[in-house]
Amino acid sequence: MSNRLKNEVIAITGGGAGIGLAIASAALREGAKVALIDLDQGLAERSAAMLSTGGAVAKGFGADVTKAADITAAITSAEQTIGSLTGLVNNAGIAGFGSVHDADAAAWDRIMAVNVTGTFLASKAALAGMLERHKGTIVNFGSVAGLVGIPTMAAYCAAKGAIVNLTRQMAADYSGRGVRVNAVCPGTVTSTGMGQQLLGSDTSPEVQARRLAKYPIGRFGTPEDIAEAVIFLLSDQAAFVTGAAFAVDGGMTAI
């Protein structure tokens, strides 16, 4: 398909690399203009420049999503540069390990801040214009860890579970005001830094087989798998979809 996002303007947090970059690339192919927002401004700008070929419009901006002034300024700059936002993808996130009894409190706070507070602050900044124009779509990033319990990942499960329910609450607030809100919940995506962190360092065939056994489809995900789901949720093909937690996990949560 093509032009599903024609004339749309999409901001993507964590857009400089990995899944965020794959979403940006897919959105451009579908006719959107994109703003890549990343903690590493240089990375965001380099990635945007790489994508800006053949008339594609991509711009990079730096922001710490845990700081209201930062993310508000980035979204304001994006709107001034490429146009009023019609879509926001809250992709920025971090993971970490630890059960409740041995979790580091500072690490807990940081995981909550980037994942949950970052989603809140970016959404708050984008919603001002979306509600005024009565038009917008927000895609939050949950995870299979927000749908089921994952051993030794207390903070990450709590954060992603919070995002899934925040998505439902936002849909209840804003769907009648022209703004759809959904969450995409990926399974393991091995080619990203977070995916490698979640899988650990043991890549022996026996361990790999045990990991793959959790995925009925027989493989791990790719950034492009997740990007295609996000594009669907951003597009008018999902015009009747709001408040959904969309599992893109190769069947992991089905068994």
Curated annotation (Swiss-Prot):
InterPro entries, per the entry: NAD(P)-bd_dom_sf (IPR036291), Sc_DH/Rdtase_CS (IPR020904), SDR_fam (IPR002347)
Membrane spanning residue stretches: none
SMART domains the UniProt entry points to: PKS_KR
UniProt cross-references to Pfam families, sorted A to Z: adh_short_C2
First-level EC class: oxidoreductase
Regulation: Not inhibited by 2-(2-methyl-2-hydroxypropylthio)ethanesulfonate (M-HPC), an achiral analog of both R-HPC and S-HPC.
Active site: Y156
PROSITE patterns listed in its UniProt record: ADH_SHORT
PANTHER family from the UniProt entry: NAD(P)-BINDING PROTEIN, SHORT-CHAIN DEHYDROGENASES/REDUCTASES FAMILY MEMBER
Protein name: 2-(S)-hydroxypropyl-CoM dehydrogenase 3
